[in-house]
Amino acid sequence: MDTLFRLVSLHHHHHHQHAASPSPPDQPHKSYPSSRGSTSSPSSHHTHNHTYYHHSHSHYNNNSNTNYYYQGGGGGGGGYYYAEEQQPAAYLEECGNGHQFYMDEDFSSSSSSRQFHSGTGAPSSAPVPPPPSATTSSAGGHGLFEAADFSFPQVDISLDFGGSPAVPSSSGAGAGAGAAPSSSGRWAAQLLMECARAVAGRDSQRVQQLMWMLNELASPYGDVDQKLASYFLQGLFARLTTSGPRTLRTLATASDRNASFDSTRRTALKFQELSPWTPFGHVAANGAILESFLEAAAAGAAASSSSSSSSSTPPTRLHILDLSNTFCTQWPTLLEALATRSSDDTPHLSITTVVPTAAPSAAAQRVMREIGQRLEKFARLMGVPFSFRAVHHSGDLADLDLAALDLREGGATAALAVNCVNALRGVARGRDAFVASLRRLEPRVVTVVEEEADLAAPEADASSEADTDAAFVKVFGEGLRFFSAYMDSLEESFPKTSNERLSLERAVGRAIVDLVSCPASQSAERRETAASWARRMRSAGFSPAAFSEDVADDVRSLLRRYKEGWSMRDAGGATDDAAGAAAAGAFLAWKEQPVVWASAWKP
């Protein structure tokens, strides 16, 4: 989930941009649009491994009729996934001809690979599995298991398609609140968990039987169960054949062919129009940032008036360090709020956004230039003095030199805010150290928005084989729970036929392949729970700042614009089992299951 848009990562390979270790030479990355731009002619320079593009303008108040590509007051757009617009023919190329391995190559099914992509519904009872093999994995005809040297006893498959799915509960908020998976009663969860346990237990006969059954039932064009079965089956196959990174590159290449700025923009806008998944975090974070600035301005003004000798100066500039993956779609609502809620002169807003890229690219720079120009025009329309800068950073976010970003422009008159929307999970290593480095910036407020899932797995060399297998089953089950909820929300929010929905679902497929088949050191799917992030923030010296009633009302008003099933829940009850630390902030819940966490923190 690697989330939809990495602030311009139109390509799937953002999965590898946040890998815990650099990809080997045989796993090249492709960078996507993410450059910088505004209205004035751009100047660029290089510092370390960052590329800067800076644009600014003074306070204009003309009524330009050029609008930013934002719709409505939800604030969102772009969520955690990667976007590309794909036509059915292109999708067949992505998941069809080049990947006909499920039935034809390894499972001796009577079906063709074309049937795998059919949209037929699941049968009311389980299909009859193929006859079990008489010997071990060395038997011919199933080379998939030959290298594993498995021994497998006779196993009867008896699955209850009417019961609850055997998905382990999350150790985070979902578990703490007793939330059940949204896919309760669905057949895919039970079959997939049985298969994951068989893979972890090296029971190759059961794996073969279950994968055959899943292959007969799965379809990327069916209902939620069929789609989940299709994506997780592809991930399991890639894991068993140790072809995860290669499969991921193939899927990314297919999606890249159909990716463009316009298609990604359309997907982002449609996603925020039909789902509060990203607007929820945007509205909550913007409210916390604005209130923090207004409080600082009011306190500074009061101190200045009470003592003529006071050195306290109310801030007149707001500088935001934006570590997010939302194509800057968060900021139009903040610009509008600054223009309408500031009692005195409208403050100057500066945004420095960090764009993670595998390598500097002209395409990335062009896209960010376009985004900057649109933001600039919208700021002029709102009458807000504004400057925008993008920093293209290659490598792990933990390696970013925050001191070199020059965030203190304006000195004492500037208030600094740090915005982390689906960004902290992109830190592959040294997460505690990175959060501590944010504390050293002495910001007025830090906003953290992350998806609620416990997908962090231990490194293979840091655990015993048994622990690694147990961790795989745990992460698999948690991933199944999380992606089931996400897919279910898409199913009920989008029309049946939608290019934007197809794009989001294909991104889910890539995220699942990454999670299931790639080594932990290379996977970009490293989400943690709210309680875990809260523990890190407290350890770094931050204290939670509760959302005000005004912000909570704004969020509730936002949710009322969407279909039933969405709600906001207090995150105070969620705890980290390992440390006993309570979370803070609020959850966006889909059918009572927490899926997105938003919080605000102060030094």
UniProtKB/Swiss-Prot annotation:
The keyword Isomerase does not apply. Pfam families: GRAS. It is found in: Nucleus. Residues 268-354 are annotated as: VHIID. Residues 11-58, 106-140 are annotated as: Disordered. One of its GO terms (cellular component) is nucleus. Residues 517-602 are annotated as: SAW. Residues 416-514 are annotated as: PFYRE. One of its GO terms (molecular function) is DNA-binding transcription factor activity. Residues 31-44, 108-125 have a biased composition (Low complexity). GO terms for biological process: asymmetric cell division; leaf development; negative regulation of mitotic cell cycle; radial pattern formation; regulation of DNA-templated transcription. A motif (VHIID) lies at residues 318-322. Residues 45-58 have a biased composition (Basic residues). Residues 179-602 form the GRAS domain. PANTHER family: OSJNBA0084A10.13 PROTEIN-RELATED (PTHR31636). Putative transcription factor involved in asymmetric cell division. Belongs to the GRAS family. This is Protein SHORT-ROOT 2.
